[in-house]
């Protein structure tokens, strides 16, 4: 688990560092150098920060799919679908009459991880049954047709709840037993 986590997250760390540092620079320029938050410069710096974190499901989807020996673009596509304006935060959606819970998946980790792991099993199953002559288009098509609804209806909402619970647990540990939690989390 630790090795896979490192393979997935380490290539993404530079983007997260850049995003955080750019936000710090923007805030310094706004607070101490008179840069207007409405200026083009501030907006560009904010866009760099936002892209670094908001598109996290895309980056994670790509990396995890690559580590799991799938086509990385399929993991990125699943992440992009999850954060698309048509899905993320949209209310009243359904798929074939099954309601899709409203969630904002930007900057999330657990939902895309669950989705790509599920995609792995679907991909492997389809690999065995789809004829080679049609694999190039039929396998990705069927994979997404199966994975996306399951991700949006079941795995994404469950992953969001798990992410919130994990965040709450870490916050509770840090607030109540920081002397124990800090070495464990470090």
Task: Give each language-model segment a name.
Residues 1-185:
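Signature of multi-pass transmembrane helix bundles
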């Amino acid at each position: 688990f630790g090795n896979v986590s490192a393979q997935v997250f380490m290539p993404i760390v530079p983007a997260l560092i850049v995003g955080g540092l750019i936000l710090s620079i923007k805030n310094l320029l706004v607070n101490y150098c008179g840069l207007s938050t409405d200026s083009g410069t501030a907006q560009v710096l904010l866009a760099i920060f936002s892209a670094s974190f908001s598109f996290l499901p895309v980056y994670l989807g790509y990396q995890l799919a690559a580590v799991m020996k799938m086509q990385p673009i399929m993991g990125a596509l699943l992440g992009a679908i999850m954060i698309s304006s048509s899905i993320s935060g949209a209310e009243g959606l359904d798929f074939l009459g099954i309601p899709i819970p409203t969630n904002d998946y930007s900057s999330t980790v657990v939902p895309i991880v669950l989705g790509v792991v599920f995609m792995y099993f679907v991909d492997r199953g389809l690999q065995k049954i789809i004829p080679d002559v049609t694999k190039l288009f039929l396998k990705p098509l069927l994979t997404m047709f199966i994975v996306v609804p399951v991700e949006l209806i079941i795995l994404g909402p469950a992953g969001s709840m798990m992410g919130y619970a994990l965040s709450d647990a870490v916050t509770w540990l840090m607030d109540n037993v920081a002397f124990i939690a800090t070495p464990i989390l470090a």
